[in-house]
C-alpha cells in the first residue's frame, strides 16, 4: 500500500513572502551516499541522529526527494536475505547493525515525515569496490565467482549473463515488494569507466553467446538494454506507482559527422564508453525519470554545462528530466555573467529556462548540508523558499484523486487544526498520497502560486 494520510492535522502558520516565480512543481532531490564511508562503523543511535540532522537541513532548504544508497557492492543497507549487510554501514561485510536497525525503513519513515520522497538507490553491476578485501560467505563473489569479471581493483557482474541480470532484478523486486519507497534508482555504473589501457575481459562471454552480433560494442549495448528493460518491468509489475529512474553520465554522445545530433562536447560518452543508450531507453518508455550527471561548469572546454543542459532539455522528451548538480564543483566556478559569484544561480536559472527540464538533484547531499559558499542558504532563501510538488508523470496509470470529504476546522489553544477524510478510490493508483493546504486572503488568488502554499 502506498503511504497515504486519512486524517492530517496541520497548525496554520504565517506565510513569509518570497519569490513568486518559483514553480509549483519541481523535482528537488539529493543523493545520500554510503560509498564515501560516512556511515561506516558509527553506532546506530549516533547515525540515526546524523541522518535526521541531514534530512532536517535538506528539507529546510526546500528539497522534496532523497535518493538513498542501499546497495554499494552487491551488499545491503537494509534487511536482506539475498545479500549481506554492507561494510559501508557496519565496517564488516555481513555484520548487522546494532539495535536490529533497518536504515532503509528508517529513511522512508523520516523522509515521509518531512513530506519528502524516498528513492532506493542501487549500484547494479559493481560487485566490489577498490578497498574491499573481505567478503561475507553469502556474497556473490563467494557464491558465483564465475559470473564476476575483475577489472583492476574492481570486480563487476558480467552484464551479458542472464543469471546476473536476474539476480539484480531479484534484488529490485525484494526492495519494491517489502518497502514503501517512492522511487527505485540506479546510477551510471553499467560497464566500467575505463582505466588507462586496462581491458574489461568479457571475450569468453562474447564468443559463447554473441546473440547474432559481430560488433562487441553493439553486443554490450544490447546487454545493458536487456537489463534496463527487465528491471523497469520488474518494478512496474509489483508496484506501478513506484518511479523508476536512472542517473547516467552527463554526456550521451558527442556531435560528430556520424552522429550530428550529439552535444557540442568532446568528452567521454555514455554510448561508446559505458555502453548505455539512454535515448533508446527513453524512446522505449523504460524510464520514468532521467537525471544526467552534468557535473561540469559552464565554460568547461570539453563538457560545457550550459551546452549540456540545453541538449538534455531538447533531446530527453517523453521522460521527466532533472539535472544532476555537483555542489563542490559549482562553488569553485565563476558565474560568466557575474564574476563575483560562483555558478550556482547561473545553473539553477538555466534549469528553469529550458522547457524540457523539471528540476535538479544535488551531489552529494552532505555538501548541501555543509553549505559551502552559502550554497544551502541560496536554495533556502532564493530558489526553494516555497514548497514544490513533484512533477506530474502523465504517462503513469491512474486517475486524479477525488475531493476530500468531511473537511472541518477546529479551534485549539495552538490555533486552527484541519480534519478531513481521504477521497474514495477504487484502485491503488487512484489514491491520494499527499495533501496540499493553501491559504488565500482573496479567492481571486490562484492556488497555482507557491506563495499560497502552506
Regions found by a protein language model. Give the residues of each.
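Active-site-adjacent "subsite" loops/lids of carbohydrate-active enzymes
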Residues: 25, 33, 37-46, 120, ...
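Catalytic domains of carbohydrate-active enzymes, especially glycoside hydrolases
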Residues: 49-76, 178-182, 280, 284-289, ...
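Aromatic-lined carbohydrate-binding/catalytic grooves of carbohydrate-active enzymes
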Residues: 63-99
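Aromatic- and acidic-residue-enriched segments that line the glycan-binding/catalytic groove
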Residues: 76-91, 126-151, 188-211, 257-267
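Active-site neighborhood of glycoside hydrolase catalytic domains
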Residues: 163-294, 299-323
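Substrate-binding cleft of secreted/luminal carbohydrate-active enzymes
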Residues: 275-301, 316-396
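Pro/Thr/Ser/Gly-rich low-complexity, intrinsically disordered linker/stalk tracts
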Residues: 374-430
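Recognizes extended acidic, P/S/T-rich segments that occur
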Residues: 430-454
